[in-house]
């Protein structure tokens, strides 16, 4: 009877998963199954973006291997995979940067060799439970892009969001910085268009000002950056983003960052196990001689 219930539960989850959490994430070349390799430029850095870090238990592993959900395959790694990736980066002498350092080197025009900046979008409970302890263990800095109007919310697009108490605990370690993922514009319309890109100028400015106020009140400082929901932005909305006082914007694209990367389209590589194996491990920056 116990196993029968488990099988029914698993089958139910597999049916539900194709209509998954925060549907509509987009990344350039994400649907291309051809062999990949990042173009290498000597003066460059890697911005590694994560969304979910799931527990490596039987149920989650079963779902991962048998589900066709892109949310599961492309937007999550297991806790064991995440730790393995961090250990690989450390063993290959990655220079882990804070967001402040990352932006400083970009503006200065020269990145240290093997520069890596770790960041997370949405900030649901899986980050606190499964990624935070590993980063703390290895003393790796990271940045979390928060949907500030939904902190602590249960069942936000089927996700339990991290609480303010947990965010403050992470911040006090000195390893975490927090930036905006909007206050309440992280949604898709019926035609799969980002709510941020459909909103009026007044709505966007009001939303981003609310988010900035939340960040400065709770975490004292902000680098004035935004990770666009779903990694999507267009040129028509950039004047509004700038008018709201933001200095940098982050997209999702399989490219290394150079000093010449557009400040409002800074590419971050969405990390799955496949992306790490085929993009990050093969990046020439980890194989050049000093």
Curated annotation (Swiss-Prot):
Pfam families reported for this sequence: Polysacc_deac_1
Keywords attached to this entry: Cell wall, Hydrolase, Secreted, Signal
Transmembrane segments: none
Gene3D superfamilies reported for this sequence: Glycoside hydrolase/deacetylase
GO molecular function: hydrolase activity, acting on carbon-nitrogen (but not peptide) bonds, in linear amides
Gene transcribed to yield this protein: icaB
EC number(s) recorded for this UniProt protein: 3.5.1.-
The protein's name: Poly-beta-1,6-N-acetyl-D-glucosamine N-deacetylase
Chief localisation class: secreted
Record's function text: Catalyzes the N-deacetylation of poly-beta-1,6-N-acetyl-D-glucosamine (PNAG, also referred to as PIA), a biofilm adhesin polysaccharide. N-deacetylation is crucial for attachment of the polysaccharide to the bacterial cell surface; it leads to the introduction of positive charges in the otherwise neutral PIA polymer, allowing electrostatic interactions.
NodB homology domain segment(s): 114-290
InterPro entries: Glyco_hydro/deAcase_b/a-brl (IPR011330), NODB_dom (IPR002509), PNAG_deacetylase (IPR023872), Polysacch_Deacetylase (IPR051398)
């Amino acid at each position: 009877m116990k196993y029968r219930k488990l099988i029914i539960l698993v089958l139910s989850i597999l049916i539900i998963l194709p209509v998954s959490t925060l549907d509509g994430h987009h990344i350039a070349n994400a649907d291309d199954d051809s062999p990949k390799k990042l173009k290498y430029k000597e003066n460059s850095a890697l911005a590694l973006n994560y969304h979910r870090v799931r527990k490596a238990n039987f149920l989650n592993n079963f779902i991962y291997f048998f589900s066709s959900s892109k949310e599961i395959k492309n937007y999550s790694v297991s806790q064991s995979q995440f730790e393995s990736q961090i250990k690989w980066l450390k063993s290959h002498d990655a220079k882990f940067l804070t967001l402040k350092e990352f932006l400083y080197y970009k503006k200065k025009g020269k990145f240290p060799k093997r520069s890596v900046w770790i960041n997370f979008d949405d900030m649901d409970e899986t980050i606190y439970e499964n990624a935070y302890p590993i980063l703390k263990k290895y003393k790796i800095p990271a940045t979390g892009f928060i949907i500030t109007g939904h902190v602590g919310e249960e069942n936000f697009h089927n996700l339990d969001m991290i609480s303010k108490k947990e965010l403050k605990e992470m911040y006090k370690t000195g390893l975490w910085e927090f930036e905006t993922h909007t206050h309440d514009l992280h949604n898709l319309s019926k035609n799969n268009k980002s709510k941020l890109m459909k909103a009026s100028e007044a709505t966007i400015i009001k939303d981003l000002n609310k988010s900035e106020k939340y960040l400065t009140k709770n975490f004292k400082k902000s680098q004035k950056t935004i990770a666009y929901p779903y990694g999507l932005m267009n040129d028509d909305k950039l004047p509004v983003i700038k008018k709201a006082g933001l200095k940098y914007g982050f997209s999702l694209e399989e490219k290394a960052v150079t000093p010449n990367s557009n400040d409002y389209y800074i590419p971050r590589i969405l990390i799955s196990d496949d992306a790490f194996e085929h993009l990050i491990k093969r990046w020439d920056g980890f194989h050049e001689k000093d």
